[in-house]
Amino acid sequence: MLTVKFKHLDLKPGQRVLDLGCGEGRHVHGFHMVDGINVVGVDIDEPSLAKAREGIEYLDGQNPDTSPTGDTSFMQASAYELPFEDDCFDVVICSEVLEHLDNYPAAILEMRRVLKPGGILGITVPHGWPERMCWRLAPPPGGYPFEPGGHIRIFDDTALKYELVNAGFTFQRKHHAHGLHSPYWWLKCALWDQRDTHWLIKLYHNFLVWDLMKKPILTRFLDAITSPIMGKSVALYFEANEK
């Protein structure tokens, strides 16, 4: 399940891509299948990186006769202090990460530092009003916002856009994603004490997995019409200015 749309990243063979906060590697796995792309997945959590590496091994095992021509690697590092030289990536993405960080402006500055002038940045965060609904349905103490490693803020995407412009980027476009996922999270939050056991939540989860694997026309249509209204995520794309 990809939140960043690769068609907006202007990918070209030989480019170097950074996925900051790659988690278990869903976007890295996508980049891995694009010929000629050299991608580095960075995350602070080593168990997530281990799963991301396993995913690459699985993909290569499924496609033994079509080895990607690019290079894929992973590295454990902090978003506040990336172990890379200035201007060394052509594309940087950071998907569903900033809402977890205490000092997200520092991470934005690091992304600007390592991204080449003219390079593309793709940022995704939870969409404001669906996220607020989650916070209200499972309020503190102990609710949705207070999950270990959970979301510590709700972004206004317009305000975030201007923060990135002030950090040295030119805004290009935005879109929303995962309209069918918001009801699932609302249901989990409404039944917070049973979020891992309730039959209805399990049923909806199975539906989302089925949709992800089968991609039927009906649910693709439903996602297309619901995402602009109640998409779980909003994606913003920028070009890095000259320094």
State each model region's role.
Residues M1, R26, K51, G55-T69, ...:
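S-adenosyl-L-methionine-dependent methyltransferase catalytic module, highlighting the catalytic core
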Residues M1-Q15, G30:
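Conserved alpha-helix/loop element of class I SAM-dependent methyltransferases that forms part
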Residues Q15-G23:
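Conserved class I S-adenosyl-L-methionine
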Residues E24-G36:
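Conserved SAM-binding loop of SAM-dependent methyltransferases across substrates and taxa
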Residues N38-D43:
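Conserved SAM-binding motif I beta-strand of class I
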Residues D45-P47:
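Conserved SAM/SAH-binding beta-strand->alpha-helix loop
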Residues Y80-V91:
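A short acidic, Gly/Pro-enriched loop at the edge of an enzyme's catalytic core
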Residues C94-V97:
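A short beta-strand submotif of the Rossmann-like class I SAM-dependent methyltransferase core
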